[in-house]
Amino acid sequence: MHPKKPDPSSIQSLSAGRRSFIAGLTGSLGVLAVQPAWAQFRVEVSGVGLTQLPIAIAGFRGDAQSPQKIAAIVQADLERSGQFRAVDTAGQNLDENSRPDLSVWRQRAADSLLTGSVTRLADGRFDVRCRLWDVVRGQDLGGQSYVIPQGDLRLSAHRIADFVYEKLTGEKGIFSTRIAYVTKVGPRYNLWVADSDGEGAQSALTSPEPIISPAWSPTGAQLAYVSFESRKPVIYAHDVASGKRRLLANFRGSNSAPAWAPNGNQLVATLSRDGGSQLYAIPATGGEARRLTQSASIDTEPAFSPDGKYVYFVSDRGGSPQIYRMGAGGGNVERVTFTGSYNISPALSPDGRWLAYISRIGGAFKLHLMDLGKGTAISITDTSADESPSFAPNSRLIVYATQQQGREALLTTTLDGKIKARLTGAAGDIREPDWGPFQR
């Protein structure tokens, strides 16, 4: 039986991930401002990976006098990646200037050691330094130093974690990247930009009407989103640096589910301007939309392949929501998902190897991961209301929304599902995450 197409007005009563799909079927804005209530995130890491690098992160000299505990932030970042296991340092503080006795750390089964210092300068800024040691080979792997204002202390810790991650794994770290997400507290919705661990949240938009589908531009300079402040879905682009926004799509009917092309020149979105919900290409500068799909069904939730050659999307053309792909210019449509009767919310890994999506199994909505080379997929969560998956820019982690203990929260997971970190705020529900790109 062909599924009934819901009324777009029902969007307000739906949870985030399904909300995006249903929107396809159918405030005030200012410069980013830090909001302390939502900066108080709690990160809880659980699970044990099959292979983890043991690292000792000594307390940084002067860390006790710093408003931010640099060593603790670095350790939390590395543990959240799923690739590192912290070795007990017994409260030792070691700075970057002297060579440590590495035999002590070998006895503690550490493969590497991070030391450092935090110094407050006379002008109020901070000098943050670190040094990384290969305990097994007895080698100095180099260090980093930053002279920064107090407000950038957390960023310096994330950059140190990036440095350690890249030195020890050979891949870029993602800890200094940003995520966007939406919160609902009482009747108000907020769009936020935050550090990758959810801290340092800054408000981009607040509205009494729903905000959905935030999508980072390839450079991280802009954030597209859908706002219902005009009592219908309208797509805007928010400039992260200036806080200004501009209209991208306000055609007749619904305008939803924006997705940036990898070159940043255009977006693909779902419009109902000609009746049914179809995919259209829209110039990044705004302007006339070009229709890409020509079906009598519902086509929505577009996502570009990282090489820009394909657009993955959700369609009910086969009788139930499934994931398809087509050429970036339209045409040559082929089905991607065949297991399960309800598959939505496609997200492509930046390395092009993986497709994350939400599959309904019985009455549960679960995050699945497909190996695009093999066409095989597995469920990687034990929750039952998963939504809105988005890959980290190094393709090693996925952030998604789910429901736990009666609230919507954000989780990150490794691709094997072994290590998860739960990000919860002080109040309200957190939904619609999108992980930003590497900073350029």
Task: Report each predicted region and the residues it spans.
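Residue-level detector of Asp-centered blade-edge/turn motifs that repeat once per structural unit
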Residues: 218-219, 262-263, 306-307, 350-351, ...
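Structural motif
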Residues: 187-192, 232-236, 276-280, 320-324, ...
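N-terminal secretory signal peptides
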Residues: 1-16, 23-34
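Short beta-strand->alpha-helix linker/helix-N-cap micro-motif
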Residues: 44-104, 114, 118
